[in-house]
Amino acid sequence: MALHQPKSVKEALSYTPGVSVGTRGASNTYDHLIIRGFAAEGQSQNNYLNGLKLQGNFYNDAVIDPYMLERAEIMRGPVSVLYGKSSPGGLLNMGQQASDHRTAQKKFSLKPVLTACSRLVLTLAMRWMMTAFYSYRLTGLARSANAQQKGSEEQRYAIAPAFTWRPDDKTNFTFLSYFQNEPETGYYGWLPKEGTVEPLPNGKRLPTDFNEGAKNNTYSRNEKMVGYSFDHEFNDTFTVRQNLRFAENKTSQNSVYGYGVCSDPANAYSKQCAALAPADKGHYLARKYVVDDGEAAKLLR
């Protein structure tokens, strides 16, 4: 991750054997993975942070920025026996960056980066060993970018303070926290086969920046997490460990998404498509609202 600087955890895992990450194209709204052919109903059943499950639901799942992590691990196979309800294919565990008493140095870095797609990234990393027993780490990030689809934007601001107390070689207590605000999470939709893989009835294809949503689509998310990790080694055989975390996630979503072209049999009973002439149905994309399940049609040009 330090070498490739991925925008999301799923992007960091794109070359992992047995893991599929492209179910939503270029969208980084969620880290949905398919492991060994199995997909979880929601990533909150399948994604862990510091050994604890990231609680949530399908539209209110937490997402951790890869810059805040020191590792991302894939556990393949049916792991429900050990970890509870999860996908038969396996699960994802992420390890957050924490202060390390072995890093006996002061380090501070502030890096602004401007990349393709008008992407501006400002990162902050600071760690310091205060004494032989105490150390802390502060990691932050601010990112703003235009998404591939026209009118879509990504904004993320995150900070993760960590503090470690290590009174001896056998005892370790680490305070971990993570705060993230995303006023805009970017594009979260999909395009129809007609106009992309296959041409439209008029022989044309949709532009690569085509957005099937509405101009006022909004999708914001706010995450707060506070917890600790404690372990004490009594001897070579017995060790006590305890992890605890309190988390609060809030999302606000009001968006329109594509539901296939009107000529698709799945949309035969759609009110918006039924009003069209048969010759026009191949030119219109059926759409629905996430919030109130309303409907609206959009002309494909």
Set out the residue ranges of the language-model regions.
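Short, glycine-/polar-rich solvent-exposed loops and beta-turns at beta-strand/coil boundaries
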Residues: 12-31, 60, 65, 85-88, ...
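Periplasmic plug
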Residues: 15, 31-78, 82
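Short sequence motifs at beta-strands and strand-loop junctions characteristic
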Residues: 27, 63, 84, 113-116, ...
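Membrane-embedded beta-strands of outer-membrane beta-barrel proteins
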Residues: 33, 72, 122, 159-161, ...
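Outer-membrane beta-barrel translocator/receptor signature
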Residues: 56, 67-70, 81-159, 167-171, ...
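Transmembrane beta-strands of outer-membrane beta-barrel proteins
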Residues: 107-111, 137-141, 176-178, 243-245, ...
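Residue-level signature of outer-membrane beta-barrel architecture
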Residues: 112, 126-128, 165, 232, ...
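Acidic/polar loop-and-plug regions of large Gram-negative outer-membrane beta-barrel proteins
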Residues: 143-147, 160-166, 170-233, 237-239, ...
